[in-house]
């Protein structure tokens, strides 16, 4: 937990960001890949989440390449559908994509050439906490423990 004056932040999840590739992709069975090896692959960007877009751009910059989206979509459901149809590759939060991987239509690969994690925090803006706020924080902990 982090605290600054009256603002308190609690980490809900620390999650690996992977590269998601469709079944049949040349690296699908590799386990890990360098972003530079995928520089020419069409990239499916998730534009509906500003924070995930910032994380994505940081990951590509860390690997020394620019992110060029061939397709932009605003929902995870559409992004995963396009990916499983073989339309490109995507950055994926490992927990959120676990079910697709179990179905076999998508493979998650560790990224070798960049720091690839995301952290989600909940901030409490004052020390005053209602029963509803505590219940909501407990709900978030349960939710993120299932995907993390």
Stretch-by-stretch model annotation:
Residues 1-2, 23, 93-96, 120:
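Short secondary-structure boundary segments
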Residues 7-23, 31-39, 111-119:
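Short Pro/Gly-enriched coil loops immediately N-terminal to beta-strands
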Residues 15, 30, 40-41, 63, ...:
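Structured helix-beta-strand junction loops
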Residues 18-20, 26, 44, 89, ...:
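Residues embedded in well-ordered beta-strands
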Residues 27, 42-63, 129-137, 147:
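Secondary-structure junction motif
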Residues 107-148:
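A late-sequence structural motif
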């Amino acid at each position: 937990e982090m605290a600054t004056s009256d603002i308190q932040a609690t980490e809900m999840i620390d999650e690996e960001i992977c590269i998601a590739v469709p079944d049949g992709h040349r690296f699908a069975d590799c386990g890990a890949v360098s972003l530079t090896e995928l520089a020419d692959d069409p990239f499916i960007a998730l534009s509906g989440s500003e924070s995930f877009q910032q994380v994505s751009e940081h990951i590509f910059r860390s690997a020394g390449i620019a992110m060029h989206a061939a397709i932009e979509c605003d929902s995870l459901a559409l992004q995963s559908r396009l990916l499983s149809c073989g339309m490109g590759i995507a950055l994926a939060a490992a927990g959120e994509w676990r079910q697709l991987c179990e179905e076999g239509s998508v493979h998650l690969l560790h990224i070798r050439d960049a720091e690839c994690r995301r952290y989600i925090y909940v901030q409490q803006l004052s020390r005053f906490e209602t029963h509803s706020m505590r219940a909501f924080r407990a709900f978030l902990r349960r939710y993120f423990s299932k995907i993390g």
